[in-house]
């Protein structure tokens, strides 16, 4: 969802734009929909932790038809990370599909902000492979049709993989503990694999402080949240204990101290060992 210099360990809770009220119109990003997110959290920081061959090993070619790998990117912002993930996973070397050894990748990318979605559509370098839509993933009624319509194009009922990159905090702050649990229940039901980048608790405090600086009301749920503390561990607990998933791999932490956690639905057949990143750093503590 939104420099290239490593952030200090004092853990700048969010990047400069996210913590500087002057960088945004007041209240302009209550859902993390920052207009220039990737300038401060560049895609490369995530990509260096994710093995390029990951999707090929999780979803090897099967049969002559080689149906495409289907992915859902929740909270895609203006699409920079979506496009970077697509190119990163397409080929381990030069961004070109190796014919005969890999499957096509099709991504449905959604965000709650129509302005960011329009920017993503206009700037998309892979329009045949990436579809951008405006969608509130927490709206149980409005999400049904676009998700099922995309899947039905390929004769599928679930995605192969769902990406939730730095979105859990915004769901949590805007919808409370119940909303976070409902979100995790829903996305885990949609896929075989789930890649989550949870924001740590210090980011919650920074988001609340930013609203106070802007003279706005605090997030309605912030002070009443019972799920708090080590958010990576909390999300692991919810997904593994309540929603039939298992933690398959932690690929390490970004320079802004967010872990990349890959979960696998327990009913999913494990095809090959998950490759580790050559730059793997730390786990969830």
Curated annotation (Swiss-Prot):
UniProt keywords, alphabetically: Cytoplasm, Methyltransferase, S-adenosyl-L-methionine, Transferase
Record-listed S-adenosyl-L-methionine binding positions: 46, 77, 111, 136-137, 165
Task performed by this protein: O-methyltransferase that specifically monomethylates 5'-monophosphate of cytoplasmic histidyl tRNA (tRNA(His)), acting as a capping enzyme by protecting tRNA(His) from cleavage by DICER1. Also able, with less efficiently, to methylate the 5' monophosphate of a subset of pre-miRNAs, acting as a negative regulator of miRNA processing. The 5' monophosphate of pre-miRNAs is recognized by DICER1 and is required for pre-miRNAs processing: methylation at this position reduces the processing of pre-miRNAs by DICER1.
Pfam family, one: Bin3
Name by which UniProt lists this protein: RNA 5'-monophosphate methyltransferase
Matching InterPro entries: Bin3-like (IPR039772), Bin3_C (IPR010675), BIN3_SAM-bd_dom (IPR024160), SAM-dependent_MTases_sf (IPR029063)
Subunit structure: Interacts with DICER1; the interaction may be mediated by RNA.
Region of interest (Disordered), residue spans: 1-28
Statement: the UniProt record of this protein carries the keyword Zinc: no
Span of domain Bin3-type SAM: 53-275
CC per GO annotation: cytoplasm; cytosol; nucleoplasm; plasma membrane
Family: Belongs to the methyltransferase superfamily.
One example of a Gene Ontology biological process annotation: negative regulation of pre-miRNA processing
UniProt GO molecular function: O-methyltransferase activity; pre-miRNA binding; RNA methyltransferase activity; small RNA 2'-O-methyltransferase activity; tRNA methyltransferase activity
Ribosomal protein in keyword set: no
Annotated PANTHER family: BICOID-INTERACTING PROTEIN RELATED, RNA 5'-MONOPHOSPHATE METHYLTRANSFERASE
Name of the gene encoding the protein in the UniProt record: Bcdin3d
Reactions that this protein is recorded to catalyse: a 5'-end 5'-phospho-ribonucleoside-RNA + S-adenosyl-L-methionine = a 5'-end (5'-methylphospho)-ribonucleoside-RNA + S-adenosyl-L-homocysteine; a 5'-end 5'-phospho-ribonucleoside-RNA + 2 S-adenosyl-L-methionine = a 5'-end (5'-bismethylphospho)-ribonucleoside-RNA + 2 S-adenosyl-L-homocysteine
EC number(s) recorded for this UniProt protein: 2.1.1.-
Superkingdom: Eukaryota
Location in or out of the cell: Cytoplasm
